[in-house]
Amino acid sequence: MELSSLIRETPQLTLRPLRPEDYAAFLSGFRACGPARNRFDDGQFDLSFLTEDWYAGLLARRQREAEADISYVLNLFRREDGASVGYCDITTQQRGDFQWGRIGCTVLNPYWGRGYGTECARALVSLGFRELGFHRLEAHVNLDNPASQRVLTKAGFVREGIRKAFIFENGVWTDNLIYTIIAPDGAESEDACGA
């Protein structure tokens, strides 16, 4: 699928792929970050590697991953002023008889508490079911991350269970809560499902 065709608008956000002309906004979003607020937040970090050449490579890599149906990464732009406030993705877990994807969303810390995460998750569900043809979407969340758990619940996800020792983080295997949402009958795109 052509990555540039995946665009969603929510009341506050535009979710779309990065374009070459977005470099300054992309960089400004990360420059605006304050110190990390919790263990899930990268906060401020060295931005020296975020050169224009690096950025061009990022855009090319994201397009290749979309064409190969590996992942679809979109940036979050605030509609009122075009500020880059985060990014999100839908990653293919398995196609065929499963049509199973995973979503993720990162809102940069200056923009927390404004409902952007919930809007993003809802938009990803719509994209995942309608444009990408997934039947099942899931999200993986640390047990001690109640903010992300609330976002997913507000977006219609249901807590399905816990995967033990699921993700290797900071030198240890961590358990993750699994939240899922299933496409309503007929919601999956027939074209995306190969029908």
Residue ranges and their predicted role:
Residues 1-39, 73-195:
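Acyl-donor (CoA/ACP) binding surface of acyl/acetyltransferases
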